Amino acid sequence: VAALLPLVGRFHEFSVATPDIRACVEFYEQLGFTQAATGDALSHPYGVLSDGRLHLGLHQHSAPTPTLTFVRPGVGSAVPAYAAAGIELTVCRTGEDVFNEIGFSDPFGQAVTVLEARTYSPPARTATEVSLLGDFAQVSLPAADFAAAQAFWEPLGFVAADEAQEPYAHLPLTSDTLDIAFHQPRTFERPMLVFRSAAMAARVARLGELGVEMLPLPRGIRADGNALLEAPDGTALLLLQGEN
């Protein structure tokens, strides 16, 4: 089965390092996320919040942040495949007596981790139970060269669509378990979690009533019901008016 998986396997979580998991949990729960039960594979304090589509891993340790984390059973035996794809591993922890994990970065510094197994159990929640943020759409990553980003990510199991100009210039890529996009660093210099809703203006108003602080929108994005938030862990949350 592993041989049929994309090189990185299935998307597991958007991992962030934070010194204060509790503050992050309170923030995301206020937005309508649900805690997931975590296992004991990791040695550091760890929590997971989910909106039914997206799982956010909160890690109290020192590591590249944020990280796109995937699961591929038998990842240790797949190490030669990464080398064949020209990927230089920055982490390679494999063997029978350890929790297998590899890591690498894309050409623009985005960290990627591939684990041998899940580290949480998804909560009993359906994708129709939408958080106050709307429907999770994609992770948008800064990349100065869209062609180079596409050339790196497509062999990992992603397929690029045509470059889009609205609501900001970006190159979307899809996969079975995660959609990503690339935006120019001048648009926004950090990764963003992108959410969409046909009623986003009302959602943004509700968030304002709850006292959630809004940041200036990324360059080129009009207000028009859109908004940008920042979580206590530093994650940027882009809320866009319109269907996914």
Where are these regions (language model features)?
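A short beta-turn/loop motif at secondary-structure boundaries
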Residues: D40-A41, S62, T94-E96, P185-T187, ...
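N-terminal beta-strand motif that seeds the catalytic metal site of vicinal oxygen chelate
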Residues: V1-R22, P66-L68, L115-Q150, L156, ...
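A short linear hydrophobic-aromatic micro-motif
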Residues: Q35-A37, L56-G57, E88-C92, I180-A181, ...
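Short loop/beta submotifs within extracellular cysteine-rich repeat domains
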Residues: Q35-A36, L56-L58, A78, A160-D162, ...
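Vicinal oxygen chelate
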Residues: A2-L5, R10-P19, G47-V48, Q60-D135, L141, E163-Q165, ...
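Core segments of cupin and vicinal oxygen chelate
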Residues: A3-F11, S15-H55, S140-L178
